[in-house]
UniProtKB/Swiss-Prot annotation:
Its EC number is 2.3.1.51, 2.3.1.n4. It comes from Arabidopsis thaliana. GO terms for molecular function: 1-acylglycerol-3-phosphate O-acyltransferase activity. Pathway: Phospholipid metabolism; CDP-diacylglycerol biosynthesis; CDP-diacylglycerol from sn-glycerol 3-phosphate: step 2/3. The chain crosses the membrane at residues 127-147, 224-244. This is 1-acyl-sn-glycerol-3-phosphate acyltransferase LPAT1, chloroplastic.
């Protein structure tokens, strides 16, 4: 936004009782009495600063407040409505109430996949009930897992199908009262005796529940800290989940070696190639570890797209559960001997299906 654009912003009557940022609104009112600043030009540089519902003060104040998905800084030492023009020594003063066109307001608009509405009481209650159902069912089912564990180690030490059946039962009980899963492409799943590397986008804590409900005996990769959690950590250990210590290169190498060993023994493994949950619903870049394992062992890569879990339980809001349904798309297996090719093809399939 240059100086000419700044000067073209005209005063406008109040459309809203408080400042908002929404790509659905044609105009946005930014009011000085709320101490909101949209932009500043100084020394040829443009900076955007916003602060909602701040209390004005005569003294210097430096604050950091959240607007949408952006972190913004505000200082009351300078007039936020004064724009400096390099071509002219004088400054131009904006009106008290200003209106910004939608193309400028979109700069501070969060991604539409994960808006940040006010959390409803019903979502909080659903989140509490979800935790209660999952906790009670896990407490009872862990007993079956413990009883059967010696036999699993004796007869099925790598795939551990019995434990995965218990995990599927637990996940199905936990999510059944709260949301439905629509699955597409079940015919693309390899047989239970065919090892494969499964990869998926990662949006929410609910991704694990959703994937366990598929009933496939694949081994997840999980942070070592989760293994110490009672019941959940015990179940993960008995299922053969592969531990990984983040930011530890040696642990990463050991993790990949363990995955290759499992694949050679007939078990499947599951990776979230993004490495973490997405905070805005967008697909991040893929790490190549999963595809290196597939290329070296010669097994297929099965891409899976998850949609809807991030809206039901957004990242960072694990205590709430919104209404909604989940869509799972299982893509055709990908074969190849080059990790780069496998990585690009798998990501392309997931990205294309997310744009539908």
């Amino acid at each position: 936004m240059d100086v000419a654009s700044a000067r073209s912003i005209s005063s406008h009557p109040s459309y809203y009782g408080k400042p908002i940022c929404s790509s659905q609104s044609s105009l946005i009112r930014i009011s000085r009495d709320k101490v909101c600043c949209f932009g500043r030009i100084s020394n040829g540089m443009t900076s955007f600063t916003t602060s909602l519902h701040a209390v004005p003060s005569e003294k210097f104040m430096g604050e950091t407040r959240r607007t949408g998905i952006q972190w913004s800084n505000r200082s009351l030492r300078h007039d936020p409505y004064r724009f400096l023009d390099k071509k002219s020594p004088r400054s131009s003063q904006l009106a008290r109430d200003i209106t910004v066109r939608a193309d400028l307001s979109g700069a501070a608009t969060p991604d539409s996949s994960f808006p940040e509405p006010e959390i409803k009481l019903s979502s909080r209650l659903r989140g509490i009930f979800f935790c209660v159902v999952a906790g009670i069912s896990a407490t009872f089912l862990i007993v079956l897992m413990i009883i059967g564990h010696p036999f699993v180690l004796l007869f099925d030490p790598y795939r551990r199908k019995f434990h995965h059946f218990i995990a599927k039962l637990w996940a199905s009980i936990s999510i059944y009262p709260f949301y439905k899963i629509n699955i597409e492409g079940l015919e693309n799943l390899p047989s239970s005796d065919t090892p494969a590397v499964y990869v998926s986008n990662h949006q929410s804590f609910l991704d694990i529940y959703t994937l366990l409900s598929l009933g496939k005996s694949f081994k997840f990769i999980s942070k070592t800290g989760i293994f110490v959690i009672p019941i959940i950590g015990w179940a993960m250990s008995m299922m053969g989940v592969v531990p990984l210590k983040r930011m530890d290169p040696r642990s990463q190498v050991d993790c990949l070696k363990r995955c290759m060993e499992l694949l050679k023994k007939g078990a499947s493994v599951f990776f979230f190639p993004e490495g973490t949950r997405s905070k805005d619903g967008r697909l991040g870049s893929f790490k190549k570890g999963a595809f290196t394992v597939a290329a070296k062992t010669g097994v297929a890569v099965v891409p899976i797209t998850l949609m809807g879990t991030g809206k039901i339980m957004p990242t960072g809001s694990e205590g709430i559960l919104n209404h909604g349904n989940v869509r799972v798309i299982i893509h055709k297996p990908i074969h190849g001997s080059k990790a780069d090719v496998l990585c690009n093809e798998a990501r392309s399939k997931i990205a294309e299906s997310m744009d539908l």
